[in-house]
Amino acid sequence: MGLLDRLSVLLGLKKKEVHVLCLGLDNSGKTTIINKLKPSNAQSQNILPTIGFSIEKFKSSSLSFTVFDMSGQGRYRNLWEHYYKEGQAIIFVIDSSDRLRMVVAKEELDTLLNHPDIKHRRIPILFFANKMDLRDAVTSVKVSQLLCLENIKDKPWHICASDAIKGEGLQEGVDWLQDQIQTVKT
């Protein structure tokens, strides 16, 4: 980044660009969350399951996010690791109403946290305990317990209860992530 670029970021004329990986099992609501974070005139009306990955952009008050929305289908999860080096933050989405697949989500999270490109970095991780509007949903505290999030000691993390369709809980998460990105060097 050149001197003028740095100066424009400091003065707030240009937003710092951040690469974020959006991970989680299929049907957890990753694409719906990312879509809801975009300006209303840029949101898609029909959300389809992501095949492979897609790249989406949205802005917060001081950052410009480039989000790699990674497919959570089993056959595509091995692609995640190819993007770990580039990621400056992670959004991990969990379907809080799907207790049966919580074990699989924990396995994928453990694999992520132990990967060499992630393990030794203080990369912030935002967890969305999504689909809180559904009758079978467990609380974000219970999701945290089921995923053993308290064992994550070397990375800043935060969990937010969310309802991606209504947009509830999303801004809280993005605000936390923005604060972490601005203070944590990955």
UniProtKB/Swiss-Prot annotation:
InterPro entries (alphabetical): Arl6 (IPR041839), P-loop_NTPase (IPR027417), Small_GTP-bd (IPR005225), Small_GTPase_ARF (IPR024156), Small_GTPase_ARF/SAR (IPR006689)
Binding of Mg(2+), residues: T31, T50
SMART domains cross-referenced by the UniProt entry: ARF, SAR
An example Gene Ontology molecular-function term: phospholipid binding
Lipid attachment, kind N-myristoyl glycine: G2
Membrane-topology annotation of the record: Peripheral membrane protein
CC per GO annotation: axonemal microtubule; axoneme; cilium; cytoplasm; cytosol; extracellular exosome; intracellular membrane-bounded organelle; membrane
Localization, UniProt: Cell projection, Cilium membrane; Cytoplasm, Cytoskeleton, Cilium axoneme; Cytoplasm, Cytoskeleton, Cilium basal body
Binding site for GTP: 24-31, 50, 69-73, 130-133, 164
Domain of life: Eukaryota
Pfam family, any one: Arf
One Gene Ontology biological process: brain development
Family of this protein: Belongs to the small GTPase superfamily. Arf family.
Subunit structure: Interacts with SEC61B, ARL6IP1, ARL6IP2, ARL6IP3, ARL6IP4 ARL6IP5 and ARL6IP6. Interacts (GTP-bound form) with the BBSome a complex that contains BBS1, BBS2, BBS4, BBS5, BBS7, BBS8/TTC8, BBS9 and BBIP10. Interacts (GTP-free form) with IFT27.
Disorder association: Bardet-Biedl syndrome 3: A syndrome characterized by usually severe pigmentary retinopathy, early-onset obesity, polydactyly, hypogenitalism, renal malformation and intellectual disability. Secondary features include diabetes mellitus, hypertension and congenital heart disease. Bardet-Biedl syndrome inheritance is autosomal recessive, but three mutated alleles (two at one locus, and a third at a second locus) may be required for clinical manifestation of some forms of the disease.
Free-text function comment from the UniProt entry: Involved in membrane protein trafficking at the base of the ciliary organelle. Mediates recruitment onto plasma membrane of the BBSome complex which would constitute a coat complex required for sorting of specific membrane proteins to the primary cilia. Together with BBS1, is necessary for correct trafficking of PKD1 to primary cilia. Together with the BBSome complex and LTZL1, controls SMO ciliary trafficking and contributes to the sonic hedgehog (SHH) pathway regulation. May regulate cilia assembly and disassembly and subsequent ciliary signaling events such as the Wnt signaling cascade.
Stated name of the protein: ADP-ribosylation factor-like protein 6
Organism: Homo sapiens (Human)
